[in-house]
Amino acid sequence: MRSTNLKNIRMGRDHQKLLNNLEEFRKTAKLTQEELSVKAEVSRKSINAIENGVYIPSTVLALKISKTLNCNVEDLFQLPED
């Protein structure tokens, strides 16, 4: 198994493995990070980390956020085209 230096991997809106539109959808819904975090039952720090590409959400969290923002998970998070 090959070792990867995780400090050099940037996840999130411009990560090569996941494109992230959360901040745009949150702002369109006129929600602060705090308001979204309360509605999605997650910490504000988690929302911030997702938006800033530090954290890729679990399937359950992605579903909670998309339900809160009344959109599909695929609207928020997409795989980049090859």
Where are these regions (language model features)?
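Conserved hydrophobic/aromatic packing and binding residues within compact polymer-binding modules
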Residues: 22, 36-37, 47-50, 76
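Short alpha-helical elements of helix-turn-helix
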Residues: 16-19, 44, 58-63
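Short basic helix-loop element that most often maps to the first helix and adjoining turn
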Residues: 20-39, 64
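DNA major-groove recognition helix of helix-turn-helix/homeodomain DNA-binding modules
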Residues: 60-75
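Short amphipathic recognition helices of helix-turn-helix/homeodomain-type DNA-binding modules
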Residues: 75-82
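A short, Lys/Arg-rich alpha-helix, primarily the initiator
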Residues: 2-28
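Recognition helix of helix-turn-helix/homeodomain-like DNA-binding domains
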Residues: 41-55
